[in-house]
Design a protein with these regions (language model features):
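Extreme N-terminal starter segment of soluble prokaryotic enzymes
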Residues: 1-5
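Amide-donor transfer/coupling interface in amidating biosynthetic enzymes
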Residues: 6, 104, 118-224
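Cofactor-binding loop segments of dinucleotide-utilizing enzymes, especially the Rossmann-like FAD-
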Residues: 7-9, 34, 90
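Short N-terminal binding/cap micro-motifs at the start of the first secondary-structure element
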Residues: 12-17
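Flexible gly/pro-rich beta->alpha loop and the following alpha-helix that scaffold active-site loops
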Residues: 23-86
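Catalytic nucleophile loop
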Residues: 77-102
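Short, electropositive alpha-helical surface patch
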Residues: 103-110
Length: 224
């Protein structure tokens, strides 16, 4: 059906369940890095752009100077080509910023599995979805809210572009990779690593189905 370009910002980030869902729907994908040392990728030959998460913040001026400015420009190129974007966590915040919204430090960060509430007739399922974020989006006027939690916007669209604050790609392997990459970092006031891994192992079979449903919602939206 087409080809998807996934952009990651850390080597331990992978398409995971979302990559599997696109494959199940007949797509192929490629995964490239976007950071200060990586060249800006070409969009030629792709039908969908997916921007994964990052530990960084879109409002960090040093990050923008190092590589995020190029990512914003790439999003502009995608818009010119009519290439729909799916933004995940940092990717959703990048979309929010690109479309004129604001991203700010959240007073209610979320780490773990959370339910979300759908809005405006969206078909985003309640979850639970895996969350790992400390920032939140303040949407631009032209955005349509698709889902929220008490602490954050959880899903939205602007035209054919869709952002989700949660991590639909996460399974137990992905979460373990994140933890192994940051052995000295763990958020305070949340469940322990072992507890999060155990819950993620329990949730992964259902999360796989939810990821497929999310890709179906996205694909239906971009061809509507």
């Amino acid at each position: 059906m087409g080809s998807v370009l996934f952009i990651r910002h850390h080597l331990e980030d992978n398409p995971g369940l979302i990559g599997d869902a696109f494959i199940a729907r007949g797509f192929t994908y490629e995964l490239v890095m976007m950071d200060e040392s990586a060249p800006t990728p070409s969009l030629d030959g792709y039908d969908v752009l997916v921007i994964l998460g990052s530990k960084e913040s879109v409002y960090d001026h040093e990050v923008e100077a190092a590589w995020f400015g190029r990512e914003l420009a790439l999003m502009g190129e995608a818009a010119q080509k009519g290439l729909p974007i799916l933004g995940i966590c940092f990717g959703a915040q990048a979309l929010c910023r690109f479309h004129g919204g604001r991203v700010e430090l959240s007073d209610a960060p979320e780490v773990g599995w959370y339910e979300v509430e759908a809005h405006n007739g969206s078909k985003i399922v309640s979850g639970p979805w895996f969350e790992f974020h400390y920032d939140r989006c303040v949407l631009p006027a032209q955005a349509q809210l698709w889902a929220s939690s008490p602490g954050a916007v959880q899903a939205f669209c602007v035209g054919k572009n869709v952002g989700v604050q949660f991590h639909p790609e996460v399974d137990e392997d992905q979460l373990r990779d994140w933890f192994e990459a940051d052995l000295d970092e763990h958020p305070r006031d949340f469940a322990s690593r072992d507890e999060l891994l155990a819950q993620t192992a329990r949730e992964t079979p259902a999360a796989r189905e939810r990821a497929l449903e999310l890709v179906d919602v996205f694909l239906a939206h971009i061809v509507d």
